[in-house]
From Swiss-Prot:
It is found in: Cytoplasm; Cell projection, Cilium; Dynein axonemal particle. Signal peptide: none annotated. Disruption phenotype: Sensory defects and loss of the axonemal dynein arms. Flies display defective proprioception as a result of malfunctioning Ch neurons caused by inner and outer dynein arms (IDA and ODA, respectively) defects. Males sterility due to immotile sperm. This is Zinc finger MYND domain-containing protein 10 homolog. GO terms for molecular function: zinc ion binding. GO terms for biological process: axoneme assembly; flagellated sperm motility; inner dynein arm assembly; motile cilium assembly; outer dynein arm assembly; proprioception; sensory perception of sound. InterPro entries: UCP037948_Znf-MYND (IPR017333), ZMYND10 (IPR052298), Znf_MYND (IPR002893). Its main location: cytoplasm.
Length: 451
């Protein structure tokens, strides 16, 4: 059985996860933990895709590591927004950017793990007061996605120029991760809304008053960041990549999660009794009625009840209520991180201290780090899993009577030997091993990135 993390390694990996400060990002110890988080994230996704026992989720929850994951997500957010700009001021065109990319990827892996764990109420229960920090984080991430969509980001098919400046490429990578993380956060907020009664009243207030999540989700559903129109037709964001769809009305996961989040909040009398349905909110929520067409309700029947509620709300008009005085908890994680930054000279000082790490020009160090990270990302294993999935789909198609010409022998693009693995990006070029793939990458990337 293929695994990214073997059962005997699981306990060690989970126990090794610890909170880092912003100044520690990119350090050897940070990279070591990054490799473990990456492996756990890949293993968790594998367990879900194959309907296996969710061991990663169980270990993270039982060892109370979800707060650490939230802490680390905030840590990377502060680094990429407050430290990275200073690093690029020092050197606008760094010689190697893969370590910066690694930090950006780290945040996506953390959010993916939170998404897996919080699907279960037991995961939500372990959050305790850190749920406030997570709500703030998710609301900010979703708002950033709305900002990108409003600027037409998702309508632009990425055609990367090979001669593109490094700074522009980094900005593109940052936006790609903002997009993926933001859509994941829709799912996370839905799980929190579904289990909001497990938390202190401060969590409900954070959702409804501080961030007005029903309003935010109405914006998300109006902008539809999971759908775009391209020269190839309508595409939807499925499994973290854009895919052509024949049926435009078919609901994808982020869309369903956004609808359910609105439903869980608006139809929960325990938390909505103090939500002021003023004129502005009624007008905003009324937009949802125009989106609730028959194909949507056929696929998501629980939304029928929400449609009835919104229709009555439109007829009843303004029902604003006085907000009661409520003492609430204050999010702590970001404040703790900022306090450590101040005690260590501020963000610019951290950037100067990390100059030798992220802006290194030592070719030996760069090559050694590249080798280490390439192993962490498990190119061979990823290709093997993708090939297994492709073979499975091909077999299902044959069983269904689709026919075919049988297995096709592919040759390695580097050494011309028989090859079963293929590039994980374009899925068009085959290789017999990771070594051959790495040798061919300088030439293949010109075609692969354009594809």
């Amino acid at each position: 059985m293929v695994n990214f993390v073997h059962p005997e390694e699981m306990y060690l990996f989970v126990e090794s996860i610890r909170p880092f400060e912003v100044r520690e990002v990119g350090s050897p110890k940070w990279l070591e933990v990054h490799e473990m988080i990456l492996g756990l994230s890949q293993q968790a996704a594998l367990e879900l895709s194959q309907n296996r026992e969710e061991e990663v989720k169980e270990f993270l929850i039982s060892r109370d590591k979800l707060r650490v994951l939230i802490h680390e997500a905030y840590c990377v957010t502060l680094w990429k927004t407050r430290v990275l700009p200073h690093l690029l001021e020092i050197d606008p065109n760094p010689q190697a950017t893969f370590l910066i990319y690694t930090v950006l990827y780290h945040e996506a892996a953390l959010v993916a793990l939170l998404d897996v764990c919080l699907y279960h109420p037991s995961g939500c229960e372990t959050l305790q007061e850190s749920v406030l920090d997570l709500i703030d984080y998710c609301a900010q991430a979703i708002s950033q996605v709305i900002g990108l969509v409003s600027m037409g980001y998702h309508e632009n098919e990425t055609k990367l120029d090979v001669d593109e400046a490094v700074l522009t490429e980094l900005e593109r990578q940052k936006r790609d991760f903002i997009y993926k993380i933001g859509l994941r956060c829709i799912s996370v907020l839905n799980y929190i809304a579904d289990n909001v009664t497990l938390f202190h009243l401060s969590a409900a207030r954070r959702l409804l008053v501080t961030h007005d999540i029903p309003w935010l989700m109405a914006d998300v559903l109006s902008f539809r960041p999971w759908q775009r129109k391209t020269s190839k037709g309508i595409q939807k964001f499925i499994d973290e990549k854009w895919t052509n769809v024949d049926d435009v009305t078919k609901i994808v996961k982020p869309e369903a999660q956004a609808w359910f989040c609105v439903r869980q909040l608006l139809l929960n009398p325990q938390i909505m009794e103090n939500y002021a349905f003023n004129e502005a909110r009624c007008k905003q929520l009324h937009k949802l009625l125009g989106l609730m067409h028959e194909p949507l309700l056929d696929q998501l029947p629980p939304l029928i009840e929400l449609k009835v509620f919104l229709s009555r709300l439109t007829l009843s008009g303004n029902t604003a209520k006085t907000q009661p005085l409520l003492l609430e908890d204050i999010p702590q994680i970001q404040e703790e991180l900022l306090k450590d930054v101040e005690e260590n000279g501020g963000f610019y000082q951290i950037a100067q201290d990390q100059d030798s790490v992220f802006l290194s020009k030592n070719k030996e160090n760069i090559c050694a780090l590249a080798t280490r990270l390439s192993k962490a990302y498990g190119t061979d294993l990823l290709c093997e899993l993708e090939q297994n999935m492709d073979d499975l789909k091909m077999g299902e198609a044959k069983d269904a009577g689709a026919g075919g010409d049988g297995d096709t022998d592919h040759t390695c693009a580097t050494c011309q030997a028989k090859a079963k693995k293929k590039c994980a990006c374009c899925k068009k070029v085959h290789y017999c091993s990771r070594d051959c793939q790495l040798k061919d990458w300088p030439q293949h990337k010109l075609v692969c990135l354009k594809t």
